[in-house]
C-alpha cells in the first residue's frame, strides 16, 4: 500500500449492502485518496497476489496515446472501495505494468479476462427489461452516468478533456501529471463500483451468463492473435439451471474479418450510414477496429446464423464494383 499521504482526494459512491441481490438505495459517499503509483509496492497486496478464495471487484480503465494495437498505454486507473490508484505506465515502466496483470495485450503481452463491461451489461439489462435493442453504438460512459437508474449525474469535465485530446493526442503522455489529468483519470473509475453493484442487482441468471460469455468474446477483440485464442481461458459454459428440456440458450461466436486497404470506407459509408444499415439488418454486434482492436479488422459477435449473415453483407461491401 502507498505509505506517503496522497495530496489528492475524491468522492466515491458505494452501495450500503453490496452483497445483497436487491435494488440498491441511495449510495453512501466516501472520501478516498488518489494514489499515483510508480512502483508495484504501492498497490494493495490482495491485488498483486489475488486469491481464488477472496475475489475482489475493481473498477478499471486506462488512458493512453492512440490506445489500440500500436498505441501507448500511459495510465491504468484502478478503483477500490477505499482508494483510487493511478498506475503510471510511463514513470513505472514495463515491470510495474506486468506486476498489475490486467493490462493491455499488444504492448505487454497480457490477456484481458474476467472483465465486466458496463456497456455490455447496460445493453443486456435494456433487453431484459423489454426495451428495444439499439443498432447504434453502445451507451457512452457519460450517458451511463446520466441515467438516473445508475448515477443520474452530469460529467461536464469529460468534454473538457475530449477537447484537449482533440487538440493534442499526446495529452496523457506528459509528466508530471497535472491536477486536471489526475482528476479526469480518477473520475473515469470512481463511479464504476457503484454502477457494477447496481447492474448485478438487476441482471437475472440468464443475462448474467450472457454478460460473462459476451464479455469474454469482447476481450478477444482487443487481443487478436494467430492461434485462434488457443492459449486463452475457455469461454464460460452454459450453467445447468439455464438448460430447460434439453435446450440451452443460444451461444454466441466471434468472427474477425480482415479489411483490405482502402475498403474500410466502403464498410462504414457516408457518416456511418452503411455500417448502421448492416447493423439494423442483423441481430449481431458489429465493431470496427481501433478502440476495440486492430484498425484493419471488423469484429462480429452474435448467434452463428446472424454472424454469418453480417459476414456476407460486409464482404459484399468490400467487393470492387
Regions found by a protein language model. Give the residues of each.
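Acidic catalytic cores of enzymes that act on phosphate-bearing nucleotides/polynucleotides
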Residues: 197, 202-266, 273-280, 301
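N-terminal accessory regions of nucleic-acid-interacting proteins
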Residues: 1-58, 220
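Polar interaction faces of repeat-based domains
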Residues: 282-294, 318-319
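Charge-rich, low-aromatic oligomerization/scaffolding segments with amphipathic character
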Residues: 299, 303-321
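Conserved DEDDh/DEDDy metal-dependent 3′-5′ exonuclease domain
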Residues: 30-202
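Short cationic amphipathic helices and targeting signals
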Residues: 34, 83, 296-302
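Beta-strand cores of modular interaction/reader domains in eukaryotic scaffold and signaling proteins
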Residues: 58-59, 77, 86, 258, ...
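The conserved glycine-aromatic submotif of the RRM
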Residues: 72, 292-299
Amino acid at each position: 500500500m502507498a505509505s506517503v499521504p496522497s495530496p489528492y482526494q475524491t468522492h466515491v459512491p458505494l452501495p450500503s449492502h453490496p452483497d445483497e441481490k436487491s435494488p440498491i438505495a441511495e449510495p453512501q459517499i466516501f472520501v478516498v485518496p488518489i494514489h499515483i503509483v510508480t512502483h508495484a509496492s504501492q498497490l494493495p497486496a490482495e491485488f498483486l497476489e489475488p486469491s481464488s478464495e477472496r475475489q475482489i471487484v475493481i473498477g478499471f480503465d486506462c488512458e493512453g496515446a492512440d490506445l489500440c494495437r500500436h498505441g501507448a498505454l500511459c495510465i491504468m486507473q484502478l478503483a477500490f472501495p477505499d482508494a483510487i490508484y493511478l498506475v503510471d505506465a510511463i514513470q513505472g515502466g514495463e515491470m510495474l505494468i506486468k506486476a498489475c496483470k490486467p493490462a493491455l495485450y499488444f504492448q505487454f503481452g497480457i490477456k484481458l479476462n474476467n472483465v465486466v463491461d458496463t456497456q455490455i451489461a447496460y445493453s443486456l439489462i435494456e433487453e431484459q427489461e423489454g426495451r428495444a435493442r439499439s443498432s447504434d453504438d453502445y451507451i457512452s460512459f457519460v450517458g451511463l452516468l446520466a441515467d438516473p437508474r445508475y448515477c443520474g449525474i452530469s460529467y461536464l469535465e469529460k468534454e473538457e478533456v475530449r477537447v484537449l485530446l482533440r487538440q493534442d493526442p499526446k495529452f496523457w503522455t506528459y509528466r508530471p501529471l497535472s491536477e486536471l489529468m489526475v482528476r479526469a483519470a480518477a473520475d473515469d473509475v470512481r463511479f464504476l463500483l457503484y454502477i457494477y453493484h447496481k447492474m448485478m442487482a438487476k441482471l437475472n441468471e440468464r443475462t448474467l451468463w450472457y454478460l460473462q460469455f459476451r464479455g469474454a468474446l469482447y476481450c478477444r477483440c482487443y487481443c487478436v492473435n494467430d492461434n485462434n485464442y488457443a492459449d486463452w481461458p475457455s469461454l464460460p459454459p452454459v450453467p445447468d439451471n439455464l438448460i430447460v428440456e434439453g435446450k440451452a440458450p443460444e451461444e454466441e461466436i466471434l468472427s474477425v474479418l480482415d479489411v483490405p486497404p482502402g475498403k474500410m470506407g466502403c464498410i462504414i459509408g457516408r457518416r456511418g450510414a452503411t455500417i448502421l444499415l448492416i447493423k439494423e439488418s442483423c441481430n449481431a454486434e458489429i465493431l470496427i477496429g481501433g478502440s476495440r482492436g486492430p484498425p484493419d479488422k471488423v469484429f462480429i459477435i452474435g448467434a452463428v446464423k446472424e454472424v454469418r449473415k453480417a459476414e456476407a453483407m460486409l464482404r459484399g461491401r468490400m467487393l470492387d464494383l
